Amino acid sequence: MTRSPPSRRSARRRPRGSGRLGPAGAAPLVTVVALSLFLSGFCSIISELSLFNLAEGLLGGTNANLTYTMGLMMFAMGLGSAFTAHRWFRNVSVEMFIGVECALSVLTMISVAGIYLLAGWLPGSAAILIWTVSPLVGLLVGLEIPIVMRINEVLGLRLRLNVALVMAPDYFGALAAFVLFTFLLLPWLGLGRVAWLGGLLNLLVAGLVALMFRAHLRHPLAVPAGVGVLLVLAGGLGWRMPDLMAFAEQLHYRDGIAQARETPYQRIVVTDRRRKGNPAYRAPALSGKVLARRGSIVLREIRGRHAAYCAEDIRLFINGGLQFSTCDEHRYHEMLVHPALSLVENPRQVLVLGGGDGLAVRELLKYEGLAVHLVELDGVMVELFRDDPRFARLNGGALADSRVEITVGDALRFLRETRRRYDLIVMDFPDPHQTGTARLYSTQFFRFAGRALAPGGVLATQSMSPLFHPRAFLSVRKTMRAAGFQVVSLQVPMLTFEHWGFQVGSRRQSEGEMQARLEAFRPAVPTRYLNREAVQAAWRWSKEFLLDAADVPINDQFTLPLPGLYRETLRR
């Protein structure tokens, strides 16, 4: 008696635990896979945003960080997708999917803390580490999507539905990461725990897949157990993450960290020499990226970590860059405020843009009858230097003074919308090392500032080091002139910043008239550094320096050449 051939339906059946997939139970698997893709997109973007923020602190806030993180990840995603055409991926399985998810989760969880630690122990390694981790994340994401599409194909999904099911959750997860990262996760959890959370969520879904579909696994006990072990280790890592990040962060600072705050806008760190710091801290002469060479002179970048010492040294760092040191901040703020104010007849209203540490406000409040309006983007900065007695004493309690009005918001938006007029506008912004801060030194910004000036009003701004960033310094000068200001450039020697520059502009007074008034400058209030001779020296420059600006571009907000000029340093 001859047997009839098996039907196609029976031929497609797979033995239990074979690792192969079939249409049976497809609906719950599809749902879990869609959730996994959502969290995978969330995890990958969280990882890259965390690395991008870390790169701002370790490498400096430049647009190149987008290439080092997002750019490399997208490129590696393409490589990962291409790899799935290899014969190794011919027969996909749930185990393969779980393995990729676990690898992505672990890499995300340890990426920030691991790079931060290694960069502290191995100065100069940060860029290499970030260039390595970012594409690895992209490679795993690139592997994951084609694997899921093949799994869905085995489950019998049509191509159109398959593509929609795979791509839509991934993109939705990416959007959720972008929205939640800046305004919720980063301020609440900090950089290390945000990356850890992204990896943990992805790992939980991998565990859910392993439990729900053990029948499809070749190793139905070992795989869920392995994911469980990873979850236990992840829990321990999350518990110790704040201590681990604090230890890693201290490696990057000579002095002990007195306060560290993460905000939606920046990482704020305040150090105090009297606190125990990093005993293995390397002086700038021994470490750091070489920026330029001139004969036997070597200029190195040390992320704003300078080796100057004084009896009491409290320093503010934003995203790893030094903003001030109590060794010499009085020189900076006295030169920023007093010469410009001396050019105004009977000043009454002063606007300070930036300067949330209150040190420029402190200098202004030395004058009787002045009302000061401070506009600062980061409210946490204001709270720190107004409410914490350790730091409020540095500005003499200026931010709590009744003569000071504080607005937390964007400076450009404020200038666009305000109808108030000010006798003096003081701009105390961070350096324009990226497009976000470079817009604050653009022609359009200076025009808005000029519109907010009262007749005869004066505008003063810091403008980087004329020694280390000469073309950027000259670009700010030319940009102010293009915005309709006559400009006098000032300079001051410092311990921490070596040599710093400022621009003072007026639409009513000529450059010669302002120079004549500065020549006769006498401090009207007590100062620590500034006197008549210091101001007389501050506005005098060599003929060669100021005339060497012919090929320096104006910083228009649509081209923004200033970040590139800032990075040129001593190329001349």
Which residues fall in each region the model found?
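Feature captures the catalytic cores and cofactor-binding loops of soluble hydro-lyases/lyases
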Residues: H333-E334
